[in-house]
UniProtKB/Swiss-Prot annotation:
Coiled coil: none annotated. The chain crosses the membrane at residues 1-21, 90-110. The keyword NAD does not apply. This is Universal stress protein B. Pfam families: UspB. It is a multi-pass membrane protein. GO terms for cellular component: plasma membrane. It comes from Cronobacter sakazakii (strain ATCC BAA-894) (Enterobacter sakazakii). Belongs to the universal stress protein B family. The gene is uspB. HAMAP family: UspB (MF_01088). It is found in: Cell inner membrane. It comes from the Bacteria. Keywords: Cell inner membrane, Cell membrane, Membrane, Transmembrane, Transmembrane helix. Its main location: membrane.
Length: 111
């Protein structure tokens, strides 16, 4: 029989790996954004996005821009593809994080 604790840690590891993939894709998206749309890059604080002095309100703007698919009207196909990838990874990572939290609650009740 599979240990529930081992299953939880495996799920947690998959979630962390997907988070790393998401942040890597987001960084690549910002590089593409800097080249194809400098105004949007500054609007979402692309230069300070992953720094300690980054502005969370501007970072949230990029998240909502991608989540609501406002990039579909953009002129650059590479940017659209990157946004689609980041959006899919965001949804996957959010679902996995939710599953990890539910699993943790289940483990606390079970054990």
């Amino acid at each position: 029989m599979i240990s529930t604790v081992a299953l939880f840690w495996a799920l947690f590891l998959v979630c962390v790996i997907n988070m790393a993939r998401y942040f890597s894709s987001l960084r690549a998206l910002l590089v593409v954004l800097r080249g194809c749309d400098p105004l949007l890059y500054q609007y979402v604080d692309g230069g300070g996005f992953f720094t300690a002095h980054g502005q969370p309100s501007k970072q949230i703007r990029l998240v909502w821009y991608i989540y609501w698919q406002r990039y579909l009207d953009h002129h650059d196909d590479e940017f659209i593809r990157r946004c689609e990838r980041v959006r899919r990874q965001f949804i996957l990572t959010s679902a996995l994080c939710g599953l990890v939290i539910i699993s943790l609650i289940g483990l606390m009740i079970w054990h």
